[in-house]
């Protein structure tokens, strides 16, 4: 018995150690931009990644191939070098037949993007411990710089560099969003700026050492991962004239708004755009920061994030709202409701959010319903009653939450209360019932009560979550609360027909 126990412990330790080992490591990630005086930009990219485990090639299949998207109309791609260094130091150059030109996946289902190209580089000489080197340059016929470089990747990074060469008269801005999450020594982050008086040019040079692997935890806030932003002004998206006269979606919008308040109606129109206009998630730099007219996006049924945002804004304006495109990448829509600015994502059906001051937008529900009693009959006098999720209930699923966590959890604040009263068949009696309560200070509370009175079955459900963003210190109690709440999603009732 002891041998079996020791073996199990050894397996557990081995599994834990393996799980913590990264699949690969970036020895170098380097980004360099040269903003030229003639209004063009040269983007130079290089990475050197070492393969540590088969998963980097098999499970993810991303380190065995490199994909580069570009627009031949305004961009020229030059591959400088691509090769593999094997464990014994042998250099394996990539043969010409390993370079495959194809339509980018993000351009599928939208004919007006068929001119974009993707170069797929299928790496050769692959083995555990090898290092893949990729180096290429893209010459762009515009000088807009709007770079966002995530500082945490799917595997650790030993050295990350970001370099910008630009004219002394250009206004260049830079910042690290989420810098408080980096937890790095000062010696591992350096920034230098130099001036060349001979040609009136400047150089910005960031260097990061020993960047950690990005956490792989569900429901992590989108802005939690640190990002280096470098930009030379807000991108000026070129939008065709006539956007404010767009009326082609009026009939469709009249059918989807339905009942509810202003926020519900606005959200319904956004949901229609999310569901019915295909998103082609193309970096706007490949399109020269141009935006299609709402009519083009509507009639083709597809578009970039900026295209969809412009369409939704035009729809809302036509419906009488004050709305406009917003967000750093023009992928949000702002709408003014009661003098307050709310924002909607066009990428998902995420709840409408109040913009500006720190604020937990609380989803509220107070409802009394009389639904039809549709019980599933089971064996031995059991019946099953499935309870539908409450409107405003967070999408977090308890079964996907680990015992511990290292990052905050994006949930959603709510204050929900719903009573459902079912009329039971004559003579049907509930054997037992449910009365479950749980509460944690600073986190929230839940209550589920199921009891019978005469021929009525009364189901009372209440859920209150106090914070949209759950800190790590509250995670354990939050997990218990959500698990208890979702355990009542499908209720097993023992009922007996009384003669």
What feature does the model see in each segment?
Residues 15-19:
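Sec/Tat signal peptide C-region and signal peptidase I cleavage site
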Residues 20-499:
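A sensor for short, sequence-defined functional sites
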């Amino acid at each position: 018995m002891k041998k079996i126990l020791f073996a199990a412990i050894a397996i557990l330790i081995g599994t834990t150690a393996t799980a913590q080992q990264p699949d690969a490591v970036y020895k170098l990630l380097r980004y360099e931009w040269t903003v030229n005086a003639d209004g063009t930009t040269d983007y130079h990219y290089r990475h050197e990644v070492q393969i540590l485990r088969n998963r980097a090639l098999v499970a993810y299949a991303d380190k065995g191939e490199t994909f580069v998207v570009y627009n031949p109309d305004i961009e020229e791609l030059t591959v400088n070098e691509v090769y593999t260094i094997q464990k014994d130091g042998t250099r394996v150059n990539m043969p010409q037949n390993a370079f495959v030109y194809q339509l980018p996946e993000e351009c599928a289902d939208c004919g007006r993007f068929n001119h974009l190209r993707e170069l797929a580089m299928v790496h050769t000489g692959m083995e555990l411990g090898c290092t893949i080197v990729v180096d290429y340059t893209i010459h762009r016929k515009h000088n807009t710089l709007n770079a966002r470089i995530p500082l945490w990747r799917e595997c650790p990074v030993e050295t990350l560099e970001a370099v910008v060469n630009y004219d002394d008269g250009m206004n260049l801005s830079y910042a690290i969003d989420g810098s408080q999450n980096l937890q790095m020594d000062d010696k591992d982050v350096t920034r230098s700026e130099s001036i060349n008086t001979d040609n009136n040019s400047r150089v910005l040079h960031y260097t990061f050492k020993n960047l950690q692997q990005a956490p792989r935890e569900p429901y992590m806030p989108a802005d939690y991962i640190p990002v280096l932003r470098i930009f030379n002004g807000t991108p000026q998206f070129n939008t065709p004239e006539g956007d404010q006269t767009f009326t082609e979606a009026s009939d469709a919008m009249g059918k989807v708004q339905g009942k509810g308040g202003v926020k519900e109606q606005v959200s319904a129109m956004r949901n229609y755009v999310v569901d019915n206009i295909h998103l082609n998630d193309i970096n706007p730099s490949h399109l020269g920061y141009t935006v299609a007219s709402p009519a083009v996006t509507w009639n083709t049924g597809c578009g970039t994030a900026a295209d969809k945002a412009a369409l939704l804004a035009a729809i809302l304006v036509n419906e009488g709202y004050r709305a406009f495109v917003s967000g750093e990448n023009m992928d949000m829509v702002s709408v003014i409701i009661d003098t307050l600015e709310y924002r909607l994502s066009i990428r998902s059906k995420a709840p409408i959010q109040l913009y500006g001051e720190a604020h937990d937008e609380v989803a509220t529900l107070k409802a009394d319903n009389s639904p039809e009693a549709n019980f599933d009959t089971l064996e031995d006098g059991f019946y099953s009653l499935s309870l539908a999720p409450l409107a405003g209930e967070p999408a977090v699923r308890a079964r996907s939450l680990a015992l511990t966590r290292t990052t905050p959890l994006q949930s959603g604040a709510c204050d929900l209360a719903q009573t459902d009263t079912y009329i039971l068949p004559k003579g049907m009696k509930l054997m037992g019932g449910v009365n479950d309560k749980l509460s944690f200070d600073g986190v929230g509370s839940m209550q589920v009560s199921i009891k019978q009175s005469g021929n009525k079955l009364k189901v009372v459900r209440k859920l209150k979550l106090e914070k949209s963003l759950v800190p790590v210190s509250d995670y354990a109690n939050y997990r218990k609360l959500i698990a208890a709440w979702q355990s009542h999603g499908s209720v097993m009732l023992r009922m007996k027909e009384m003669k």
